[in-house]
Amino acid sequence: MAASKVKQDMPPPGGYGPIDYKRNLPRRGLSGYSMFAVGIGALIFGYWRMMRWNQERRRLLIEDLEARIALMPLFQAEKDRRTLQILRENLEEEAIIMKDVPNWKVGESVFHTTRWVPPLIGEMYGLRTKEEMSNANFGFTWYT
């Protein structure tokens, strides 16, 4: 038996047509220059907004400071009234405690001067509860 002849595939007559091998990607978005320009514009806008906000913050800070300065004499007067009230109550308590001690002068200054010496918190709240002293030292606290 004779072997059959193998027929090899050949190109068509005249050859194959040209093959398009270049990438054909659609154009997407902005060009690099326009994206750079948009970025610079956003940066400039952000700096401008930040500058405006800093001016507003500075104006609000000055307003707060002026309000605090205006109210400072009132707060100082309230603090002085509270201090004098506590000292008066301490003098009354001292008179009760030291009534049996001879030659004891109630309210005599331990400093031998006529100048006003602001009392320390320990002196003011020495005859009061620990809770009142800790509130005076650290402010009012809700936690234990």
From Swiss-Prot:
It is found in: Mitochondrion inner membrane; Nucleus. Its main location: mitochondrion. GO terms for biological process: aerobic respiration; cellular response to interferon-beta; cellular response to retinoic acid; extrinsic apoptotic signaling pathway; mitochondrial respiratory chain complex I assembly; negative regulation of DNA-templated transcription; positive regulation of execution phase of apoptosis; positive regulation of protein catabolic process. The modification N-acetylalanine is found at residue 2. This is NADH dehydrogenase [ubiquinone] 1 alpha subcomplex subunit 13. Accessory subunit of the mitochondrial membrane respiratory chain NADH dehydrogenase (Complex I), that is believed not to be involved in catalysis. Complex I functions in the transfer of electrons from NADH to the respiratory chain. The immediate electron acceptor for the enzyme is believed to be ubiquinone. Involved in the interferon/all-trans-retinoic acid (IFN/RA) induced cell death. This apoptotic activity is inhibited by interaction with viral IRF1. Prevents the transactivation of STAT3 target genes. It is a single-pass membrane protein. One of its GO terms (molecular function) is ATP binding. One of its GO terms (cellular component) is mitochondrial inner membrane. Belongs to the complex I NDUFA13 subunit family. The chain crosses the membrane at residues 30-51. Complex I is composed of 45 different subunits. Interacts with CARD15, but not with CARD4. Interacts with STAT3, but not with STAT1, STAT2 and STAT5A. Interacts with OLFM4. It comes from the Eukaryota. Keywords: Acetylation, Apoptosis, Electron transport, Membrane, Mitochondrion, Mitochondrion inner membrane, Nucleus, Respiratory chain, Transmembrane, Transmembrane helix, Transport.
